[in-house]
């Protein structure tokens, strides 16, 4: 199985490196030639503990490659993971230009049936729009199936978050896409949650929002504890024994998370 990863930022590079670490043959595509040459030396362009070692080990083993030649990469691809950025526009909406630029490259160059997987955080319904884009723009008579596979990583722990994920969410609309992604992720040994694409997109936003809600709540409780002379860690510990609220570790962890 030839896997291609579009984009070598936090999401794309960590995804590609970890797939190679699991034994898959992976080609990471980026438009920046200097960046590609640096990665071929086993040096990550982003700081992430453990990533340099994974890049170096798997590049030398021949499981991981880096290229700017997207035409050749997509022609040989069986699965393409899209992990490019979706920066915020001035009006607050997500800029999907990079996503659709990659889709244009895939549509122009793909020569075989392929599963295209969106790892990037995108608005609800984007996978459906990508599917329509391929129907209208693909150059060859091939099957292109779209899947949503949101990431749940954090900077500084991205490698651990990927290799030891709490769960792997797969949003699909066909048995073929489900079978392909399940066959890839079963070696991770983590729970695989299979949903439709819109549910997978929503799981990403709902998870982020719920965590933000918990952080806001515990911060307010910390402020109140300071006013009344209580100890927030003792309060969190006392709350944690209630199974409806959560365990001690998760509550104390939230106390240490940055608020920005």
Give the role of each language-model region.
Residues 256-260:
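A short, hydrophobic C-terminal helix/tail in secreted or cell-surface proteins
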Residues 1-255:
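Structural/interface elements that position substrates and couple domains in central-metabolism enzymes
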């Amino acid at each position: 199985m030839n896997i291609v990863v579009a984009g070598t930022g936090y999401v794309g590079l960590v995804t590609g490196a970890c797939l190679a670490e699991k034994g898959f043959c992976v080609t990471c595509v980026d438009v920046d030639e200097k960046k590609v040459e640096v990665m071929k030396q086993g040096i990550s362009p982003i700081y992430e503990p453990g990533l340099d070692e994974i890049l170096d080990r798997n590049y030398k083993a021949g499981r991981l490659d880096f290229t700017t030649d997207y035409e050749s990469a997509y022609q040989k691809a069986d699965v393409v993971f899209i992990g490019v950025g979706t920066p915020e526009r001035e009006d607050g909406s997500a800029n999907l230009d990079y996503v659709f630029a990659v889709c244009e490259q895939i549509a122009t160059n793909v020569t075989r049936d392929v599963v295209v997987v969106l790892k990037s955080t995108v608005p609800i319904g984007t996978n459906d729009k990508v599917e329509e884009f391929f129907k209208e723009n693909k150059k060859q008579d091939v099957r292109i199936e779209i899947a949503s596979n949101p990431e749940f990583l954090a900077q500084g722990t991205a490698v651990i978050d990927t290799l030891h994920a709490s769960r792997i969410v797969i949003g699909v609309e066909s048995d073929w896409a489900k079978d392909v992604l399940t066959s890839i992720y079963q070696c991770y040994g983590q729970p695989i949650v299979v949903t439709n694409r819109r549910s997978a997109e929503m799981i990403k936003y709902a998870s982020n929002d719920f965590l933000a809600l918990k952080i806001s709540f515990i911060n307010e409780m910390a402020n109140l504890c300071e006013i009344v002379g209580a100890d927030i860690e003792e309060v969190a510990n006392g709350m944690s024994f209630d199974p409806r609220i959560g365990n001690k570790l998760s509550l104390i962890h939230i106390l240490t998370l940055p608020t920005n």
